[in-house]
A protein has these predicted regions:
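Extracytosolic ligand-binding ectodomains
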Residues: 23, 30, 36-48, 64-434
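N-terminal secretory signal peptides
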Residues: 1-64
């Protein structure tokens, strides 16, 4: 039963209908009383006016209830959640920009058969509890689907609660394998931690590295997850992992861990952390005299483009990381996206902007697929399932590569190995989808 808080009290539609009948009965009784008693016409008019005012108020409240419980017939509401304040806000804001750009273009080109896609955007501050609160808020607002969350830990929290509601969910960037494990409703536009760990271990083998060390944030699902898979894959490939060094979230001095790794003389060091930590680690390693190779994962995105407070282009020279998108990629679709993004925001997009763009592309394609069939009504359980089925079956040609699904919410897609050459990023190798 639909309920809404009105003037500080929860009033149900059933209660509104009952109250309306009471007022109508009251007015009819007044008419009878006027005929059977000495009630004057002036008194009757006054009491009738009061009853009419009450009836009008109930009508307004009922109208508010109806408006709040349904979507406009010419729009489709989609939630967008992420960290727009806090320590990881740069990722959330980048994805939000990409989502908004694609939806703007999509609506300008006719939307979903004339219907616009409207976005409900909410900040979860990078916190799992807040992310679940935002999810409940979106549920109350009757969104049809959600693009989110962004980082792995809040994304897992949302995926857990959304599975019971069968809410269609697309994360642009959550890489933790568990994100898609709770139900068939959750999908991602990016690669998994497992995929990245294996890709970089195989890359190390192809580069001829016989020994590697690792340094990672033990408090992060993303960092520790990729490190674990990388180490396991290296062992399978015959690469000796000489030292694994963990650090705590928030640490800024990595000299002890780096010194321990360098004492084992590895051919390369794997550093699967977000770019703030990774940049500091590379910088401190160079200060310690290490001139060797660092390997990274997609959290390295944003390391360059003038962000020299973490690592300089000179310090990053000859390092490698995997990532599905860089602006330097000489691809026509990428070039068009970079131009459109720069025109909209006055700066170049990052990997996370591109993933947000592709996540919105996936969602809008599914919305149109369902609308084209026209056999289910938005807001129903049947509509949610139809949307989930459409996401699973549609294939989109995104700016981070083609995205398709084969039985799970994890995409089959290509990625890039990126290197740093004379202060600039460039594509070193394309890893094709299997």
């Amino acid at each position: 039963m639909m309920t809404r808080f009105v003037f500080g009290q929860k009033i149900s539609n059933k209660a509104l209908q009952y109250s309306s009948r009471v007022v109508i009965t009251y007015i009819n009784d007044l008419k009878g009383d006027m005929m059977m008693t000495n009630l004057t016409r002036r008194q009757f008019v006054k009491l009738s006016a009061q009853a009419g005012t009450l009836m009008g108020g109930l009508s307004i409240i009922a109208g508010c209830n109806n408006n709040m419980s349904s979507q406009s017939s010419d729009s489709l509401k989609v939630g967008v959640m992420g960290p727009y304040t806090g320590d990881v806000a740069q990722y959330g804001l980048a994805i939000r920009n990409g989502v908004q750009l694609y939806v703007k273009q999509f609506n300008a080109n006719g939307g979903v058969n004339g219907k616009t896609v409207d976005l409900m955007i909410e900040d979860e501050k990078g916190d799992s509890t807040e992310a679940k609160n935002v999810y409940e808020k979106m549920l109350d607002a009757k969104v049809l689907a959600i693009i989110g969350d962004v980082t792995s830990t809040p994304s897992i929290a949302v995926a857990q609660v959304s599975a019971n509601d069968n809410m269609p969910l697309i994360s642009a960037s959550a890489t933790a394998p568990a994100f898609t494990s709770f139900g068939h409703n959750a999908f991602r536009a990016t690669m998994t931690d497992d995929f990245q760990g294996k890709v970089m271990a195989k890359f190390a083998q192809k580069q001829g590295y016989k020994t590697v060390g690792t340094i990672y944030n033990s408090g992060g699902d993303y960092e520790s997850g990729i490190n674990k898979i990388f180490v396991e894959e290296c062992q399978q490939l015959g690469i000796n992992v000489t030292s694994q060094q963990a650090y705590a979230a928030g640490d800024v001095d990595f000299n002890a861990q780096l010194t321990a790794i360098f004492a084992t003389s590895p051919d390369a060091v794997f550093c699967p952390n977000y770019y703030q930590d990774s940049g500091k680690i590379v910088t401190q390693a160079r200060q310690l005299g290490y001139k060797g190779v660092f390997l990274g994962a997609d959290g390295w995105a944003n390391m360059v483009d003038g962000d020299d407070k973490y690592a300089s282009p000179e310090d990053l020279e000859g390092c490698y990381y995997n990532c599905p998108f860089i602006v330097e990629n000489d691809n026509d679709k990428v070039k068009d996206f970079v131009k459109a993004y720069h025109d909209e925001y006055g700066k170049n997009p990052s990997n996370f902007c591109a993933l947000g763009y592709d996540a919105a592309m996936m969602m809008c394609a599914a919305l149109k697929t369902v609308d084209d069939k026209g056999d289910v009504k938005p807001g129903t359980e049947e509509y949610k399932q139809a949307l989930i089925d459409a996401i699973a079956q549609d294939k989109v040609d995104g700016v981070t590569g083609s995205i398709a699904f084969e039985g799970t919410g994890d995409p089959v897609k290509s990625t890039l190995v990126v290197t740093f050459d004379k202060g600039k990023q460039k594509v070193f190798q394309v890893i094709e989808a299997k």
